[in-house]
């Protein structure tokens, strides 16, 4: 089945709109533009689709309300701008969707919400309940309280995480560019447009450039990585220009617009997807070549004897990274032992665990049922 048919038939969509598409060149929110997005999403809703909107714009709106002309560099100033701007962003979306008889809900997420399994499931339940009630959730990172999200995060990644969270059928990333090119077309006039590719293809990241403006955070690379992440749950991604007239309606109608990134066939198990979606891990273990081979080729559990080094501090039950001696991540899994315990039993046979610790929680450091290969 062609990708555009899958987009057309998708029941649950996640739409991410960038700062440049909802602000007046960074000078606060562009209410007319937001009105157009509300109208397009209302049309999708009328066609029977569920839509979750991931919207940038809070910091830009906060800057305008505070009279700032340049994006500040200090984290506390960015947090202040986000706090002020989030009020305006929610108000404008609420009023514009109300014109179409649609209620909206503001949902602010942090990495911690998605890293903790219980909070992850609660967030999923809330979002699915909102969709069932006919509400359009409008999601943003909680920039006001989480410094890492402002400093390192972006809403492209958040869009992919939300797609996986709700098991969306497709992620649509709208930007001020036509889509993906083999090079930055603003610097390389001979750059070729990429209309279709497989999400996660190594050559895609090599094509991507840096951030495009001082207002937003996400460059094309973040969109490529977001598509790769969304593909793990079986969701396709479209990167398209939000300047195209009625772009959402046309995509939903099956028209091939922008760069369409196909997801490989199949959907990863929900718990394994949750492990992959951890952006920040508190620890990792270095494996010898034999352990790497048994994990990747043999489908075996990770035993303490295959661990050469334990890095970071983590508790039992946390997600940890498993890397080879070159530092390449090969797997992630739920550990049966804390970092302190793992250091004591590293390079030891499972039969020696009780003699070392005085007890045995499990014969494996990570059981294969709690392990996901990367």
Swiss-Prot record:
It catalyses: L-glutamate + ATP = L-glutamyl 5-phosphate + ADP. It is found in: Cytoplasm. The keyword Nucleotide-binding applies. The keyword Ligase does not apply. Its EC number is 2.7.2.11. It comes from the Bacteria. Substrate binds at residues 56, 143, 155. ATP binds at residues 16, 175-176. GO terms for molecular function: ATP binding; glutamate 5-kinase activity; RNA binding. One of its GO terms (cellular component) is cytosol. GO terms for biological process: L-proline biosynthetic process. Keywords: Amino-acid biosynthesis, ATP-binding, Cytoplasm, Kinase, Nucleotide-binding, Proline biosynthesis, Transferase. Pathway: Amino-acid biosynthesis; L-proline biosynthesis; L-glutamate 5-semialdehyde from L-glutamate: step 1/2. PROSITE patterns: GLUTAMATE_5_KINASE, PUA. Residues 282-360 form the PUA domain. SMART domains: PUA (SM00359). It is an enzyme of class 2 (transferase). Catalyzes the transfer of a phosphate group to glutamate to form L-glutamate 5-phosphate. Belongs to the glutamate 5-kinase family. This is Glutamate 5-kinase. It comes from Ralstonia nicotianae (strain ATCC BAA-1114 / GMI1000).
């Amino acid at each position: 089945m062609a990708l555009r048919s899958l987009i057309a038939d998708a029941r649950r969509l996640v739409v991410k709109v960038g700062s440049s598409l909802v602000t007046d060149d960074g000078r606060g929110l562009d209410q007319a533009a937001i009105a157009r997005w509300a109208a397009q999403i209302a049309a999708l809703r009328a066609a029977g689709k569920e839509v979750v909107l991931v919207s940038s714009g809070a910091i830009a709106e906060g800057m305008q309300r505070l009279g700032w002309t340049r994006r500040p560099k200090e984290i506390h100033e960015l947090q202040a701008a986000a706090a002020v701007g989030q009020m305006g962003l929610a108000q404008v979306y609420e009023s514009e969707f109300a014109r179409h008889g649609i209620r909206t809900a503001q949902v602010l997420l942090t990495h911690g919400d998605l890293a903790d399994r219980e909070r992850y499931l609660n967030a999923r339940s809330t979002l699915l309940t909102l969709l069932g009630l006919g509400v359009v959730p409008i999601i943003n990172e909680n920039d006001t309280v989480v410094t890492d999200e402002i400093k390192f995060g972006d809403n492209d990644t958040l869009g992919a995480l939300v797609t996986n969270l709700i098991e969306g059928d497709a992620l649509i990333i709208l930007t001020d560019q036509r889509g993906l090119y083999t090079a930055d077309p603003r610097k390389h006039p001979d750059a070729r447009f990429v209309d279709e590719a497989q999400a996660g293809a190594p050559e895609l990241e090599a094509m991507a450039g840096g951030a495009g403006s001082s207002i937003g955070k996400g460059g094309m690379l973040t969109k490529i990585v977001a598509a790769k992440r969304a593909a793990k749950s079986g969701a396709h991604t479209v990167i398209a220009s939000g300047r195209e007239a009625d772009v959402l309606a046309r995509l939903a109608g099956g028209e091939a617009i922008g760069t369409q990134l196909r997801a490989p066939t199949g959907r990863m198990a929900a718990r394994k997807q949750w492990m992959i979606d951890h952006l920040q891990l508190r620890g990792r273990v270095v494996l010898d070549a034999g352990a790497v081979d048994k994990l990747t080729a043999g489908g075996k559990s990770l035993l303490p004897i295959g661990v050469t080094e334990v890095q970071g501090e983590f508790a039992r039950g946390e997600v940890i990274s498993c890397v080879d001696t070159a530092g390449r991540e090969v797997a992630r899994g739920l550990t049966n032992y804390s970092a302190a315990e793992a250091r004591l039993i590293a390079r030891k046979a499972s039969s020696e665990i009780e003699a070392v610790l005085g007890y045995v929680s499990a014969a494996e450091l990570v059981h294969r049922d709690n392990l996901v290969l990367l």
